Amino acid sequence: MANKPSVDDLKENLSEMQFYVTQKHGTEPPYTGRLLHNKRDGVYRCLVCDTPLFNSQSKYDSGCGWPSFYEPVNENSIRYLTDLSHGMERIEIRCGHCDAHLGHVFPDGPQPTGERYCVNSASLSFTDEKSGDQIKG
């Protein structure tokens, strides 16, 4: 995929958890993510390549323990793959630009889409709309 940093660069610039989640398709423990309770207005971006993924307006509290969104910024920002791991069938979501693992999407979200994009904080950064401050998950 385009613009993906080298493994050495990723290991140098990401925490162990961020590398595990984005590159090894891992999952951070529920209720531990830095961006789970973030309520500020802004944009959630791919931690690896800075591609905009979700607007804060689509974030909601699903009670699942990870940041949840009902729709991505646009149809090209997310890549969808069938995930048959752990004895179940799920839809994995990855960054549409650099292929970093983000989480999964489920058909149990609120309207208007009915979808729940369940995303690891460790795969995201957040840019505050007003201040421009950036928080890494």
UniProtKB/Swiss-Prot annotation:
Zn(2+) binds at residues 46, 49, 95, 98. Pfam families: SelR. Binds 1 zinc ion per subunit. The zinc ion is important for the structural integrity of the protein. InterPro entries: Met_Sox_Rdtase_MsrB, Met_Sox_Rdtase_MsrB_dom, Mss4-like_sf. PROSITE patterns: MSRB. NCBIfam families: peptide-methionine (R)-S-oxide reductase MsrB (TIGR00357). This is Peptide methionine sulfoxide reductase MsrB. It comes from Escherichia fergusonii (strain ATCC 35469 / DSM 13698 / CCUG 18766 / IAM 14443 / JCM 21226 / LMG 7866 / NBRC 102419 / NCTC 12128 / CDC 0568-73). The gene is msrB.
